[in-house]
Design a protein with these regions (language model features):
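Short catalytic/metal-binding and nucleic-acid-binding patches
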Residues: 1-200
Length: 200
């Protein structure tokens, strides 16, 4: 639905009707309710992909700390994360997905208020909705790890994963070793992962 604002009125009506018939939120990504302890990717973007998070390095660090703090209360494990100037990605394990999403929503509200004050932009829409996807397989898990760690390279911010400071990539490489990280990259390629929904 990120293309919604670019659609004609007829295309918008058709898109909303399509979602309504499938009992999905009319203007937002669906949030599937899963039972039990499961793994998910969670992604969220700044409204219209503006580089609001990345206004300053300090704000990037603040966003990273805030998001990871939320995860520390509602996730049993954070496998991978990456904070970029206009969006973030997480790979987590949780049995409290609803509570985690709710707290991320509150976190988005607090950061919106704070950042809009700092930027003298009261009323600016900062965040778009979160999207969560359940991990379906071993291959999906490792492709997600690779995708998240590769994201700063994909978007042209750095040449190597470990050079991006707002990511778990350097810790991951240190933990598993460069050789194992390279093997995982080769065995679980990103290919077109995220092509239709990642945030430029």
């Amino acid at each position: 639905m990120y293309e919604y604002r670019k659609m004609t009125p007829a295309q918008r009506r058709e898109a909303v009707e399509y979602r309504r018939l499938r009992e999905r939120p009319w203007h937002s990504p669906p949030h599937w309710e899963f039972q039990g302890l499961l793994q998910f990717t969670i992604s969220s973007a700044c409204y219209e992909h503006q580089h609001i998070i990345g206004a300053t390095p300090e704000r990037m660090t603040e966003c990273e700390s805030t998001i990871l703090d939320v995860c520390s209360h509602f996730a049993t494990h954070v496998y991978a994360w990456c904070i970029l100037p206009n969006h973030y990605h997480l790979l987590i394990q949780t049995d409290q997905l609803g509570a985690l999403r709710a707290e991320l929503g509150r976190c988005h509200g607090r950061t919106s208020f704070k950042w809009n004050g700092e930027d003298h932009r009261r009323g600016r829409h900062v965040w778009h909705n979160c999207l969560n996807r359940g991990i379906k397989s071993h291959r999906h898990f490792w492709a997600s790890v690779n995708y998240i760690h590769h994201n700063p390279v994909h978007h042209g911010y750095v040449q190597r994963w470990q050079d991006w400071p707002w990511s778990s990539a350097a810790d991951f490489i240190e933990h598993v070793g460069r050789e194992t990280a390279s093997k995982i990259w080769r065995e679980y390629p990103v290919l077109d992962y995220g092509k239709t929904w990642d945030f430029d």
